[in-house]
């Protein structure tokens, strides 16, 4: 649901209610037709997808807070589903995720949900898990152990967004998380090709990382 943020940005720039209408219609349809069950846990409700939605939903809803289309009825539906996501991620079994980028994406989403809902148990649990995961997954030289530039930068995105959110909420940032972000950002400095893209190693796309470097410089200055 990354495109929900794009809809929000379009709404913020234009004020055109068609973007709010699309957001409400698509999200309502998704919530009503994609329930959490044993089958959906294999596809649309894998923990990694639920974690990614935690970020995208809580970010995108803010763009539409002044739209009349985001009414009490919709917010009740939205909040109930967000609570379901939070409980699902909070109770997720801790297996391979501890040493996988999946775990970071899951608990990064749990952090966003915890802050959005004011659920301290979610927020604190997410931070403890994230701190453990970056210590296990990030080598001393700053490289993510799965040896994929794309996975490296997905994890770095989550770590930077964690720092950003904690700064915005005036909360203490765990030192291990900040240290991991600095090391990972410096890896991007070394990795970046002349065209600004990351190398195509492992399961990687040819993605420009200059925006990631800019965010790193701002947050870690």
Which residues make up each language-model segment?
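Active-site lining segments of carbohydrate-active enzymes
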Residues: 35-150, 154, 160-164
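Short amphipathic alpha-helical/adjacent loop interface patches that line ligand
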Residues: 27, 86, 185
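Non-membrane alpha-helical segments in proteins
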Residues: 1-13, 25-33, 48-63
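Carbohydrate-active enzyme catalytic cores, enriched for enzymes
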Residues: 150-221
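Alpha-solenoid helical repeat scaffolds
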Residues: 6, 13, 33, 63-70, ...
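A short structural micro-motif
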Residues: 29-30, 132-133, 187
């Amino acid at each position: 649901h990354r495109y929900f943020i794009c809809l929000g940005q379009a709404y913020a720039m234009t004020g055109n209610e068609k973007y709010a209408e699309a957001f409400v219609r698509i999200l309502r349809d998704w919530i009503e037709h994609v329930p959490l069950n044993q089958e959906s846990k294999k596809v649309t409700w894998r923990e990694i997808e639920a974690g990614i939605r935690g970020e995208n939903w809580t970010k995108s809803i803010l763009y539409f807070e002044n739209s009349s289309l985001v009414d009490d009825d919709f917010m009740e539906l939205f909040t109930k589903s967000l609570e379901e996501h939070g409980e699902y991620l909070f109770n997720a079994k801790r297996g391979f995720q501890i040493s996988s980028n999946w775990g970071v994406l899951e608990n990064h989403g749990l952090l966003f949900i915890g802050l959005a809902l004011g659920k301290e148990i979610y927020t604190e649990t997410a931070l403890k898990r994230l701190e453990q995961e970056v210590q296990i997954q990030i080598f001393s030289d700053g490289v993510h152990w799965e040896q994929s530039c794309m996975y490296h930068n997905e994890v770095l995105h989550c770590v930077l967004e964690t720092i950003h959110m904690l700064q915005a909420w005036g909360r203490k940032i765990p030192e291990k998380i900040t240290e991991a972000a600095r090391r990972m950002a410096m890896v991007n400095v070394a990795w970046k090709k002349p065209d600004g893209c990351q190398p195509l190693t492992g399961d990687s796309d040819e993605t420009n990382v200059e925006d990631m470097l800019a965010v790193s410089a701002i947050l870690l200055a």
